[in-house]
Amino acid sequence: MRQEGVPSFFLVMFINFELFLLVMEKEVKYPTAEQIIEYNVLALTLIKVKKADRPQVLSHARIELIIKNCKQLEGDLYDKAICLLKGIIQLHPFASGNRRTAFIVAKEFLKENGGKFNIEDDPTQANVMQGIRENYYTDDEIKEWIQHGKIKAFKRFEK
């Protein structure tokens, strides 16, 4: 004996589930290699540090690897932003300005995807970027820094 209302219940549940998937599958916008290279040029133009700074790509393959790793990473937008940030800093795809470029790329990635980047554009943040390069911070600490702008001071490991 068929119960009235059951098929319509499942139909409503199916439709709601499909709508849920559409909302959840909001396309994440990843930077292209060309955009990351443009951000490097921008970083070196806007933030002068050394006279010898020059926009030069050392490895296109490293840039592509950084993007690929970010796309494959399970996690939220902040985890992916950290992947971009650390990837550019640690894989060093440019002759100059890797940390400055990483900062801009992570910030723009989050803004483009509706995330928040609560780190001040301040030269004092350079020490934190050095700490990221040297694996001083955990990903959770970096996530907290991006979301709330606070992180412990970087101190070099003593030998």
Question: Where do the protein language model's features map onto the residues?
Answer:
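FIC/Doc superfamily catalytic core
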Residues: 2-159
